[in-house]
């Protein structure tokens, strides 16, 4: 474990902070982190803020004045990572969602309330989606064998089996409240007592069973009292939410039954199920003022012994022993320093003895450890069942040591320690919020302190990348562990595994793997130019599918193939270098579009024409792999797409000449489209068959050498060099950052002076998705991708149906799958 970066507040007067209040923290599958702080202003009023940041740009924190009247006690992300629940000590629950799908713009439109009753536990209802990781099958060829869907029922279903959305919360007075979000937007809320005899609930946690039930664990805070468990069933009867509860077996902590320890740990300070969908295992922590003890318990079915008298009366009873559920302790720690925070892994690894042995044999450790933070400032990763220490992180010297002795607080514990922690979704990173509001990001090695061969470490990272590819989770935390020397191997292995999948699955994952390769290639100076190629291929695939979708069959009773499919088939069959001869074989009536639509598409068509020209001009320099676009010169599939688009553009140009790409030629009589199509076809013929690519002949190379003297080659605006952190982080050299202040980061591998990547200050900007020029200092509000840096305008300047269809693709996410964030006008 080592520190990746630390982010502090610009001005944080100690008199304005309320250290006695609890902090909450949550980490989404999209690598957004939400956390709370509580500040006093000059009037001594409390402002309960929720801070949301993207792990790649932590200084760009978005702070929301939550509107909660009391301290926020819980934060919880949904499965998609796009909505956030917050609950406070007054019983108010709010549901936050992105405004305009921007990661730094949030609004709350719905919520619920149990007035005056503090919320101690909060969770979204389970949607029935659960994946299992099969570590022992990491070498299998099919993703379906490595990651399988587990049969798991949603907490509540709508008509047709669709899971119903909503949340469940437990209050300090022993109430359970459930709110259901109907498709109409209406919220159904119901509240019920956990049991007939209500009692104080100081700590609680929520888990789900495969049968669709909910399990609540509750404790009153005293280690002398039992930890109680309840089964909660939610249903909708006559358009009203109904809650049924049932008492389950309870337990007493082991330390309370030991005469030597009975009074040493008077309070239960932490109560957690080991996983949201694992209600059979629970973690408990009992503490005194200075020390703690942690126990892990498991719920098991055991046979109930039957007295011989009853066996003689009824032999049937003796044949089939009755079974009961009973809590059994799995492990316990020795006395520890006082535990200040606990973080549990989210990686869905099974914890049966067989699976643990497999994990040990394969040396796959991510997801096996949970994190304990102590008041001495240290963090221990311990095995989630045996509780044995696997890795330790020691923070730097506490701040109080830097102060004069007279000013130091009279306390036995140091000033700085984590009050809230969360593990990432692959368990390779840990975020901690300390008692001064400072955010620390820690790398957690995949080996967790065990010696691992480099080849095996690479295999584990590949396995987790595949997991993110299948689930759609963001993989930023995996990139923290990728060294420049690993990039080439990871990209090649990832491509090999991808090509082994069925064609249908390949099509589903086609954009995700390109985005993954692009983010990997940013980490090495040898592969940084390929980042441009991968993003360009994403853009080309999007343009191709959009333009083909505009084509309509002339008659309704058409054969099975769409006009787009016929276009691809004819272009692949006819290898003629004359664009007009290829065009003759197509039914041109299928390409007829409205004139306004054609004109609105001109910028996209211009990009296609410019890119073809750029590629052909690059052909004589193909020996330079650092030049953007290099990989396209051997990519028969992409060249085939460009060839199809050139044919479509040619046909549309006959309908409306002003929609054609504009070329600046040295001769007025030159047919630029025909010239480029002829050269493009020759290049495509050389590499259209995979594995049998031939070198372009000298005649083609000579003609491409002459292109700059025949046509003016435009400057292509590649994606901007990323301003994110991950490509700039150095091992053992944590970055010191400040919230709200853009840092001066050390040079990254992607800032090398490569052709097409250099940018001078004040250089004109471009809308990367609409291909519109924004000027050197844009006046329109823009948004940028958190992952690749792609910039586009927030509001559309064009209302044409075809353009709207194109822009609808990028409403929620960038073409690489990254989230959007609003950028200031000065940064656009």
UniProtKB/Swiss-Prot annotation:
- Ranges occupied by WD repeats: 67-106, 198-240, 263-307, 621-662, 777-816
**Is Metal-binding one of the keywords?**
no
Protein's UniProt keywords contain Transcription regulation? yes
Q: Name one GO molecular function term.
A: transcription coactivator activity
Q: Which SUPFAM superfamilies match?
A: Soluble quinoprotein glucose dehydrogenase (SSF50952), WD40 repeat-like (SSF50978)
Cell compartments where the protein resides: Nucleus
Write down any Gene Ontology CC term. Answer: nucleus
Query: What's one GO BP annotation on this UniProt entry?
Result: positive regulation of DNA-templated transcription
* Matching PROSITE patterns: WD_REPEATS_2, WD_REPEATS_REGION
Keyword field: Activator, Nucleus, Repeat, Transcription, Transcription regulation, WD repeat
Kindly give the SMART domains that the UniProt entry links to this protein.
Answer: WD40
* Assembly notes: Component of the Mediator complex, which is composed of MED1, MED4, MED6, MED7, MED8, MED9, MED10, MED11, MED12, MED13, MED13L, MED14, MED15, MED16, MED17, MED18, MED19, MED20, MED21, MED22, MED23, MED24, MED25, MED26, MED27, MED29, MED30, MED31, CCNC, CDK8 and CDC2L6/CDK11. The MED12, MED13, CCNC and CDK8 subunits form a distinct module termed the CDK8 module. Mediator containing the CDK8 module is less active than Mediator lacking this module in supporting transcriptional activation.
Cited function: Component of the Mediator complex, a coactivator involved in the regulated transcription of nearly all RNA polymerase II-dependent genes. Mediator functions as a bridge to convey information from gene-specific regulatory proteins to the basal RNA polymerase II transcription machinery. Mediator is recruited to promoters by direct interactions with regulatory proteins and serves as a scaffold for the assembly of a functional preinitiation complex with RNA polymerase II and the general transcription factors.
Q: Which family would the database say this protein is a member of?
A: Belongs to the Mediator complex subunit 16 family.
Protein name (database record): Mediator of RNA polymerase II transcription subunit 16
Native source organism of the sequence: Mus musculus
Encoding gene per record: Med16
């Amino acid at each position: 474990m080592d520190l990746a970066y630390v982010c502090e507040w610009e001005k944080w007067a100690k008199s304005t902070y309320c250290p006695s209040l609890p902090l909450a923290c949550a980490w989404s599958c999209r690598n957004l982190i939400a956390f709370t702080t509580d500040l006093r202003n000059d009037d001594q009023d409390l402002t309960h803020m929720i801070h949301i940041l993207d792990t790649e740009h932590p200084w760009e924190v978005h702070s929301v004045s939550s509107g909660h009247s009391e301290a926020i006690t819980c934060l919880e992300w949904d499965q998609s990572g796009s909505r956030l629940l917050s609950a406070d000590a007054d019983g108010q629950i709010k549901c936050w969602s992105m405004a305009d799908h921007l990661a730094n713009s949030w609004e709350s439109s719905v919520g619920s309330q149990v007035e005056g009753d503090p919320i101690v536990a909060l969770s979204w209802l389970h949607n029935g989606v659960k994946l299992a990781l099969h570590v022992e099958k990491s070498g299998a060829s099919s993703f379906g064998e490595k990651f399988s869907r587990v049969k798991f029922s949603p907490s509540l279903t709508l008509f047709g089996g669709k899971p119903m959305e909503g949340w469940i919360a437990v209050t300090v007075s022993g109430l359970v409240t459930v709110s259901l979000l109907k498709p109409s937007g209406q919220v159904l809320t119901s509240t019920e007592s956990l049991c007939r005899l209500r009692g104080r609930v100081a700590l609680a946690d929520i888990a789900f069973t495969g049968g669709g039930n909910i399990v609540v664990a509750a404790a009153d805070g005293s280690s002398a009292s039992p930890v109680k468990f309840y089964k909660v069933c939610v249903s909708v009867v006559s358009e009203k939410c109904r809650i049924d509860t049932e008492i389950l077996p309870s337990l007493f902590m082991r330390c309370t039954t030991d005469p030597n320890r009975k009074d040493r740990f008077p309070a239960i300070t932490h109560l957690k199920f080991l996983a949201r969908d694992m209600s059979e295992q629970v973690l408990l922590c009992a503490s005194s003022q200075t020390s703690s003890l942690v126990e892990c318990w498991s719920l098991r079915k055991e046979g109930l012994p039957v007295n011989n008298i009853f066996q003689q009366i009824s032999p049937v009873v003796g044949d089939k022993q009755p079974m009961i559920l009973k809590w059994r302790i799995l492990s316990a720690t020795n006395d520890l320093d006082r535990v200040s925070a606990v973080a549990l892994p989210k990686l869905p690894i099974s914890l049966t003895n067989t699976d643990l042995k497999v994990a040990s044999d394969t040396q796959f450790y991510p997801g096996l450890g949970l994190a304990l933070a102590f008041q001495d400032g240290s963090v221990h990763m311990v095995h989630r069942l045996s509780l044995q220490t696997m890795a330790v992180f020691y923070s730097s010297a506490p701040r109080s040591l830097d102060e004069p002795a007279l000013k130091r607080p009279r306390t036995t514990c140091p000033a700085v320690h984590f009050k809230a922690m969360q593990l990432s979704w692959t368990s390779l990173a840990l975020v901690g919020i300390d008692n001064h509001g400072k955010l620390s990001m820690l790398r957690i090695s995949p080996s967790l302190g065990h010696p691992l061969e480099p080849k095996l470490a690479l295999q584990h990272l590949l396995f987790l990348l595949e997991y993110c590819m299948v689930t759609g989770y963001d993989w930023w935390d995996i990139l923290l562990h990728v060294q420049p020397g690993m990039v080439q191997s990871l990209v090649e292995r990832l491509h090999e595994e991808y090509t082994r999948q069925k064609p249908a699955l390949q099509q589903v994952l086609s954009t995700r793997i390109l985005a993954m390769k692009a983010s990997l290639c940013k980490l090495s100076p040898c592969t940084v130019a390929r980042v441009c190629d991968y993003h360009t291929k994403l853009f080309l695939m999007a343009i191709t599918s959009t333009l083909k979708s505009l084509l309509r069959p002339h008659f309704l009773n058409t054969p099975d193939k769409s006009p787009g499919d016929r276009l691809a088939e004819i272009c692949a069959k006819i290898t003629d270098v004359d664009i007009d001869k290829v065009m003759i074989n197509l039914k041109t009536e299928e390409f007829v579009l409205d004139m306004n639509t054609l004109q609105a598409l001109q910028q996209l068509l211009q990009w296609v024409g410019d890119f073809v020209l750029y590629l052909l001009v690059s052909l004589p320099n193909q020996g330079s792999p650092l030049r953007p676009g290099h990989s396209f010169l051997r990519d028969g599939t992409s060249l085939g797409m460009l060839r199809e688009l050139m044919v479509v553009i040619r046909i549309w140009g006959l309908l409306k000449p002003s929609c054609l790409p504009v070329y600046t030629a040295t001769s007025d009589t030159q047919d630029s489209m025909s010239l480029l199509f002829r050269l493009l076809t020759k290049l495509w013929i050389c590499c259209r068959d995979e594995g049998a690519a031939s070198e372009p002949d000298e005649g083609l190379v000579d003609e491409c050498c002459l292109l700059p003297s025949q046509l003016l080659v435009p400057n292509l605006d590649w994606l901007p060099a990323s301003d994110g952190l991950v490509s700039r982080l150095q091992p053992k050299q944590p970055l010191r950052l400040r919230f709200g202040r853009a840092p001066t980061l050390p040079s990254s591998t992607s800032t090398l002076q490569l052709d097409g990547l250099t940018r001078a200050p004040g250089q004109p900007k471009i809308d990367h998705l609409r291909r519109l020029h924004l000027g050197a200092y844009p006046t329109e509000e823009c948004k940028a991708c958190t992952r690749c840096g792609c910039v586009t305008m927030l509001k559309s300047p064009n209302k044409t149906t075809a353009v709207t269809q194109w822009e609808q693709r990028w409403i929620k996410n960038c073409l690489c799958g990254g989230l959007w964030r609003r950028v200031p006008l000065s940064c656009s």
